[in-house]
């Protein structure tokens, strides 16, 4: 449940919003015993945000800021009795921001650059002695995308590069969608990934994937 206010001023759009996500996706964690089904917990939290867009000729600028209050985070807690550490959840506050620009080279080509980052606020102050936040308290990504619509829209080429802001991982992809007839369309894609051992994408280091999909409409 929430509300939004929007203003449009000479090529710019500005909006403010607030919402309470009481039906948000459940937060899952491993059972304390280490065996059995995962434990679920309601992940309701308050979300406040602001968004601004500005068009300057062929250039579109955008900025989004979001504040999340009492969002659940996984924390590793050491036992004072010398038992094995266990994973618990704590409600913490998070701040995120996204900035981007999109430039229309012509009617068929455009290029987009975006940067996003998020961080837990006062994460160290929220943790007691013996508690450690699982994962990074701050993370971010940069995205560069080029797209070209060819043959009167029958073919669409897209080249995408995505990297973590700390350069711990890099993903590159090339895709081509082509409409053969009114009933047939084909999509091909190549994805290459590089990641450091401590990255969330470590299992995909030096990974190369190729795929093709044929769609028939009738």
Feature roles, as predicted:
Residues 11-14, 58-63, 108-113, 152-157, ...:
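Repeated loop/turn-to-beta-strand initiation elements of outer-membrane beta-barrel proteins
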């Amino acid at each position: 449940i929430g509300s939004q206010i929007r203003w449009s001023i000479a090529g710019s759009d500005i909006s403010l919003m607030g919402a309470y996500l009481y039906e948000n996706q459940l937060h899952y964690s491993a059972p304390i015993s280490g065996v059995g089904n995962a434990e679920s917990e309601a992940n309701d939290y308050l979300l406040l945000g602001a968004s601004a867009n500005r068009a300057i000729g062929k250039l579109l600028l955008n900025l989004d800021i979001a504040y999340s209050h009492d969002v659940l985070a996984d924390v590793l807690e050491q036992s004072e009795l010398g038992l094995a550490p266990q994973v618990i959840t704590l409600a913490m506050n998070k701040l995120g921001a996204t900035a981007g620009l999109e430039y229309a080279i012509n009617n068929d080509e455009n290029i987009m650059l975006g940067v996003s980052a998020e961080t837990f606020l006062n994460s160290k102050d929220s943790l007691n002695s013996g508690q450690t936040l699982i994962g990074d308290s701050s993370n971010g990504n940069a995205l560069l995308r080029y797209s070209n619509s060819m043959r009167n829209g029958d073919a669409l080429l897209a080249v995408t590069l995505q990297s973590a802001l700390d350069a711990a991982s890099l993903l590159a992809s090339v895709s081509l969608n082509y409409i053969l007839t009114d009933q047939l369309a084909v999509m091909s894609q190549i994805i290459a990934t590089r990641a450091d051992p401590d990255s969330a994408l470590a299992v995909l280091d030096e990974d190369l994937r190729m795929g093709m999909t044929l769609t028939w409409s009738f």
